[in-house]
Amino acid sequence: MANPKGTPRRTLLTGAAATAAAATVQTVNPAAAAEPDRLAPRPPSRELRALLREIDHRRIEATVRRLAAFGTRHTLSDQDDPERGIGAARDWILARMREYARTSDGRMTVDLQSWVQPPGPRVPAPTRISNVVATLRGATSPDRVYVVSGHYDSRASDPMDHTSDAPGADDDASGVAVVLELARVLAPRRTGATLVFAAVAGEEQGLYGAAHLAQSYKDQQADVQGMFTNDIVGSSTADDGSRDPHTIRLFAEGVPTSETPQEADVRRSVGGENDSPSRQLARFVREVADPDATGMKVRVIYRRDRYLRSGDHIPFLERAYPAGRFTEPAEDYAHQHQDVRIVDGKQYGDLPEFCDFPFVARVARVNAAALWSLAQAPGTPRGAKIVTTALTNATELVWERGGEPDLAGYEVVWRETTSPEWTHAVHVGDVTRCTVDLSKDNVFFGVRAVNRAGLRGPVAFPAPQR
């Protein structure tokens, strides 16, 4: 039995699962259990560093300027004009995605996902809306999916004004530029899981494109284990002129949007307000997005989104998919949702001249580190539970074994209830049950999978098993 130095009641006990299905899983010898590790951010692999170096701020700048040059990309704007309007922007994005797909040796497919949106808020008449969706199929776990998006529609001061110029450089050509650059650098590479690169429309009118995309995955019963939207990621300068060029915010909800009344009852009984799947996803991003390699600090914000605002991750949260939103550190509202104009010598409007393109490239590197690490590591464990059939000061955890072909085993992680990050981990081997000599009253536990390359997936927060 292992007993961490200087810490009572932390002996690790392991054993085979009790179920017949898990009886073939390897049992760990308690005497061989290692001391718990103190967790630290993971340095990127040589392969990941090479990927990050390929991200080019000049390409990102060219994308933002090209999208802004379509005049307006309002969802209700012209769809057939080849030079101006959302239709021209849609076709240009589609052409870029198809260009990148040609480097994928057939692994990337590109679809134009179009439908007629019925009349609703900010959509006065039936309107065709289109998402451009590129799917890079995984080689070993193709059914496990991670989505990254930006919205290519734009708006002026009046959300219904579909004729005035609305260049939408920061909101959200910057996010689309991130998605396109990610598609470009990842298309030639083989990933374990499937990655989806989506440029969605209808965001400014009511998150219509993201809702359609999320519902399409729900209808397919797709295993979407993570989604990131990049929305307003173009500037490092606040409205007072101060700059923060090396910080990106990542918004991650606590209590799940999709939580049922029964799940709420359990949460109130055992805790876990800070342990939603989206929070675990955000912790994973901070762990793998090394600032030395990305040039960026990820500031996780414990909110679903900015105060009283929303974004394209929310339709995914509503359908119980883990999701988060990347947004620049401080928004400048003179360059967001504004008519292009000059008032008292001050320029208003969301113009490319107010973007910081090396900053956007660093945002893309954070996304790339997260997506690559998610796709190459094992998925989030399923069925993680804490056994509560008997009162005891030890904690017994069970979970289901994953199907990844390179799965090496599992780690149990824990932290103090007041700590925002996981602080300790111990490798328990290729088992589906273990007992830790720590009270579940005093710490929070989690379980994560590890593959033979040593890559660790996101943590699963266990529910009680009665």
Report the location of each language-model feature.
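Alpha-helical metal-binding/catalytic segments enriched in His/Glu/Asp
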Residues: 148, 154, 159-207, 367
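Extracellular fibronectin type III
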Residues: 452-466
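Beta-strand-rich modules
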Residues: 437-455
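A non-catalytic alpha/beta surface segment that caps or lines the substrate-entry region
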Residues: 59-137
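Conserved aromatic anchor
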Residues: 393-405
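Active-site-adjacent mobile loop/cap segments within catalytic or ligand-binding domains
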Residues: 68, 233-251, 300-378
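N-terminal secretory signal peptides
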Residues: 1-7, 16-25, 32
